[in-house]
From Swiss-Prot:
It is found in: Cell inner membrane. Its EC number is 3.6.1.27. GO terms for biological process: cell wall organization; peptidoglycan biosynthetic process; regulation of cell shape; response to antibiotic. It is a multi-pass membrane protein. The lineage of its organism: Bacteria, Pseudomonadati, Chlorobiota, Chlorobiia, Chlorobiales. One of its GO terms (cellular component) is plasma membrane. Bacitracin is thought to be involved in the inhibition of peptidoglycan synthesis by sequestering undecaprenyl diphosphate, thereby reducing the pool of lipid carrier available. This is Undecaprenyl-diphosphatase.
Length: 282
């Protein structure tokens, strides 16, 4: 991988991490189309630290408030004493499924599940599920029922959205896509579903990035070229990730996820056609 490729992949990671179109799919598809080769699951996990930093900075006020409330609640012996503390523990509970599945199926995630057949099926599959979720949201709104706020989430909501997040381990599904979809099914409004999705991503993205960084440390340190590529890609992911968060939260205040559904369907079907005609290797 050269520096130009690293920059492009970092930009792609940042732009697609928070949109419900799957960053892992695009980091698999673009190199395949350009003839660059698969950058690998480890590269993807490490540059996600850049998008993690984007979430930390964008939601700094919320994160400080939630973390402070959790610590204060533990000190006072009232761990669920405030809405912020309760949200913090819900994020922790919602993180458990992806940790369990991620460690259990780590080998499969890094090998067979990166097939473009899997990616295309995931792109199309989640698009169809998201259609149903949007229909559910429209029915709720038509009945005059408002969406839940983050403070109104139940433990069942947190577990179900957490289980949905575990599906993001399959390339093409999209972390934000599956968690926003789960949130819509649990009667969150679109913006709240996206906000909780981003906060929920923090523990798992940090853990995955640190694990891959530790496991590949010798390979990274063996070459300043590798270090530079990772650093540049991570910085690009941070910049464009921050912009992507701001865009999506503002967009979902007034729009449905319809444009992303259409994009996923077109890309998924296009992949199948290109693979079937021999223009792209799976």
């Amino acid at each position: 991988m050269n520096l130009f490729q690293a920059i492009i992949l970092g930009i792609i990671q940042g732009l697609t991490e928070f949109l419900p179109i799957s960053s892992s799919a695009h980091l698999r598809i673009v190199p395949a189309l350009m003839g660059w080769g698969d950058p690998g699951a480890a590269f993807t996990a490490i540059i996600q630290i850049g998008t993690l930093a984007a979430v930390l900075i964008y939601f700094a006020k919320d994160i400080v408030s939630i973390s402070g409330a959790v610590i204060s609640g533990l000190v006072k012996g009232k761990p669920l004493g405030t809405d912020e503390a309760r949200t913090g523990w819900m994020i922790a509970v919602g993180t458990i499924p992806i940790v369990v599945f991620g460690l259990t199926f780590k080998h499969e995630i890094e090998t067979v599940l990166r097939s473009l057949y899997i990616v295309s099926a995931s792109m199309i599959g989640l698009a169809l599920v998201l259609v149903v979720a949007e229909k559910h949201t429209a029915n709720r709104a038509r009945d005059g029922r408002r969406g839940k706020s983050i403070n109104e989430l139940s433990w069942t909501d947190a577990i179900i959205i957490g289980l949905a997040q575990a599906m993001a381990l399959i390339p093409g599904s999209s972390r934000s896509g599956v968690t926003i979809t789960g949130g819509l099914f649990r009667n969150l409004d679109r913006e709240t579903a996206a906000r909780f999705s981003f906060l929920l991503s923090l523990p798992s993205v940090f853990a995955a990035g640190m694990l891959e960084l530790y496991q590949t440390r010798q390979e990274i340190m063996s070459s300043t070229h590798n270090m530079l590529n990772l650093a540049v890609a991570t910085i690009a992911a941070f910049i464009f990730g921050y912009l992507s968060i701001a865009f999506l939260l503002n967009y979902l205040k007034r729009h449905t996820t319809g444009i992303f559904i259409a994009y996923r369907l077109i890309l998924g079907i296009g992949l199948i056609v290109m693979i079937g005609t021999g223009h792209l290797l799976p």
